[in-house]
Amino acid sequence: PYRFIRSGRVNPGAYPLNMTRKERKMKWNPEEYKEWWTPKWYEAIAKGMFVKRDLKDGQMSRDMTLFVDDDGKAYHIYSSEENLTLHIAELTDDYLQHSGRYIRIFPGGHNEAPALFKKDNMYWMITSGCTGWDPNEARMFSASSIWGPWKQHPNPCRGQNSEKTFGGQSTFVLELPENRFIFMADVWKPKSLMYSGHIWLPIQFDEQGVPFIEWTDEVNLSAQSEWKLVWSDEFNTDGLPDTTVWSYDNGFARNEEAQWYQKGNAY
């Protein structure tokens, strides 16, 4: 059975690693910023007004996910600062506490529902905007280090209804064998939450290695679904294929059938 350990806010007394010395020394009078969404208010948010407000007792943590890196380090990614700014916070080696190391991502960007994954030493994160139960356009960010700097990309979704993330909201990215990834999204039904559901869609990558997501009515999670057979003109010969390029096998079913294959061409 699960055992309750504790509850609490995140990293009390600790400043974000990417908050400047000048920002850490700034003082804010909340009475001057009662009106939200003004340019003056946005500037204060970007410079860490809410971080300073919550510094003593710890940062707000909501709409979150967890990510474990290749080296076993775990990270808590969550919406903070009144749901206005994402934080990435490192956990201790036993995963039971925060280490005190964390960063802010796009302060005031109003991102939530983070889903993080890593491919070819690049970190990718898909999020949503904050529109309550209603779906909205997905956002995507990347960084070569989990500590940033993070770069924003266009909506990763393509095709019909992509501006609404196909009716869903990002929740997790599932990594499969052979460097394949599944984008998972919640489909909320606020009038009757018991009928809420999920979307699972394969993440594809363009020639530059940038992820994108297209709608498909059916997803085959079998590794064999990724196999491809590519014809080579080298087979157009009266004799045997070029043995300096092609390898030979007697067949996987021990039927002595000659099988020729080329690494990287037929797999």
Language-model-detected regions and their locations in the chain:
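Carbohydrate-active catalytic/glycan-binding domains of CAZyme proteins
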Residues: 1-267
